């Protein structure tokens, strides 16, 4: 079988709360690490989420 183009990634909160989102991205077109501004319910504000590996 062929290698899948989309991979699952974990977006870790930069606020240090331990909250994370799991999403997917196209590994061929987005080669750099993903950084997204999303809502952190623990910190109760919008913060940057940085890409990390799923363990």
From Swiss-Prot:
Q: Does the keyword Lyase apply?
A: no
Q: Which GO terms describe its biological process?
A: translation
Q: Which InterPro entries does the record associate with it?
A: Ribosomal_bL33, Ribosomal_bL33_CS, Ribosomal_bL33_sf, Ribosomal_zn-bd
Task: Report a single Gene Ontology molecular function.
Answer: structural constituent of ribosome
Family membership: Belongs to the bacterial ribosomal protein bL33 family.
Keywords from the named record: Ribonucleoprotein, Ribosomal protein
The molecule here is called Large ribosomal subunit protein bL33
Keyword Ribonucleoprotein among record annotations? yes
One GO cellular component term: cytosolic large ribosomal subunit
Please give the organism: Jannaschia sp. (strain CCS1)
**HAMAP family cross-referenced by the UniProt entry:** Ribosomal_bL33 (MF_00294)
Origin, by domain of life?
Bacteria
Kindly give the PROSITE patterns that the UniProt entry links to this protein.
RIBOSOMAL_L33
């Amino acid at each position: 079988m062929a290698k899948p183009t989309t991979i699952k990634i974990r977006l870790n909160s930069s606020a240090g709360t331990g909250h994370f989102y799991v999403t997917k991205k196209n590994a061929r077109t987005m080669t750099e690490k993903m950084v997204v501004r999303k809502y952190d319910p623990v910190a109760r504000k919008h913060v940057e989420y940085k890409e990390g590996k799923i363990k």
